[in-house]
Amino acid sequence: MSRVGKAPIALPKGAEVNVAAGVLSVKGPLGTLSQPIHSLVKVNVAEGTLTFEPADESREANALQGTMRALAANMVKGVTTGFERKLQLVGVGYRAQLQGAALKLQLGFSHDVIHEMPEGVKAETPTQTEIIIKGADKQKVGQVAAEVRAYRPPEPYKGKGVRYADERVILKETKKK
């Protein structure tokens, strides 16, 4: 059994936590995030730490305690330092550039792919073949990165496509006569 839920979350300077009407909200320099609290979990805020307790002794309450603690830890990290995901474009003529708040991708299609960024998520293009997606909400950052990668996932023979910077693409051997 994991004991993630029992570990307290230290609140860094600049992070404020508020628990009201069954909603946990965390405010920091990068914005505000909120998460509904499950009825099987109790939240305690004291002396710069955030702790979670199960409301009863059921297995579901113990599981939700760990889940709520992990979500809250991601919220605290998100509003203080933020999250980022790096993508690489591999292929001849594959390019990315910002067009206002949207991301314009040239991925070998007959048309350019324009991906609108949701609220709270920003994209940067340090080079034409690199994309950095940043934001306070870990789930949104990962979702946007997955959506951009899905336009042209890495193909298994040459490795062309959009990939995460830390992703290793295993190449297949071509058919021999």
From Swiss-Prot:
PANTHER family: 60S/50S RIBOSOMAL PROTEIN L6/L9, LARGE RIBOSOMAL SUBUNIT PROTEIN UL6M
Subunit structure: Part of the 50S ribosomal subunit.
Keyword Transmembrane helix: no
InterPro entries assigned: Ribosomal_uL6-like (IPR000702), Ribosomal_uL6-like_a/b-dom_sf (IPR036789), Ribosomal_uL6_a/b-dom (IPR020040), Ribosomal_uL6_bac-type (IPR019906), Ribosomal_uL6_CS (IPR002358)
One GO cellular component term noted in the UniProt record for this chain: cytosolic large ribosomal subunit
Keyword Nucleotidyltransferase: no
Assigned keywords, A-Z: Ribonucleoprotein, Ribosomal protein, RNA-binding, rRNA-binding
PROSITE patterns linked: RIBOSOMAL_L6_1
Gene Ontology biological process terms from the UniProt entry: cytoplasmic translation
Biological role stated in the UniProt entry: This protein binds to the 23S rRNA, and is important in its secondary structure. It is located near the subunit interface in the base of the L7/L12 stalk, and near the tRNA binding site of the peptidyltransferase center.
Descriptive protein name: Large ribosomal subunit protein uL6
Family note: Belongs to the universal ribosomal protein uL6 family.
Entries under NCBIfam families matching the protein: L6_bact
Gene: rplF
Single GO MF descriptor: rRNA binding
HAMAP family: Ribosomal_uL6_B
Pfam families on file: Ribosomal_L6
